[in-house]
C-alpha cells in the first residue's frame, strides 16, 4: 500500500481530500503547529517551515522517512516552493500535485 502525504492539514480542503482517498495510507502534515492528540502520531506530521533555507531537503527527507510515493499539496505557498524541485522528487519516485479545491483520487 502506497503512502500519500497531504499538506495543509489545518485546511478543510485537506480533510475533504483525505476522505476521498481510499486505496492508500494517508498521512497529513502542516508547517503550522497541530494539536497533539493521543493516537494521531501516525496520522499527522509536522512539516518543515517554508522559510527554512533547507526547506526542500527537509521536505524530501521527511518523504523518504515516511516512504511517501505521492504528495498532495493543498497549501499554495508549499506548491510555489516545491514545484521547482519536481525533478529532484521524481528521482526518488515521489510524485506531487497541487490540489486546488478537492479532487477525487484513489
PLM regions: where:
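ATP-binding N-terminal substructure of ATP-dependent carboxylate-amine bond-forming enzymes
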Residues: 1-105
Amino acid at each position: 500500500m502506497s503512502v500519500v502525504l497531504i499538506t495543509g492539514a489545518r485546511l478543510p480542503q485537506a480533510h475533504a481530500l483525505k476522505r476521498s482517498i481510499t486505496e492508500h495510507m494517508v498521512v497529513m502534515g502542516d508547517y503550522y503547529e497541530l494539536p497533539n492528540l493521543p493516537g494521531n502520531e501516525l496520522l499527522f506530521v509536522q512539516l518543515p517551515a517554508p522559510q527554512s533555507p533547507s526547506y526542500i531537503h527537509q521536505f524530501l527527507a521527511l518523504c523518504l522517512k515516511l516512504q511517501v510515493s505521492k504528495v498532495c499539496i493543498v497549501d499554495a505557498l508549499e506548491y510555489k516552493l516545491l514545484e521547482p524541485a519536481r525533478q529532484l522528487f521524481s528521482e526518488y519516485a515521489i510524485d506531487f500535485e497541487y490540489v486546488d479545491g478537492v479532487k477525487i483520487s484513489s
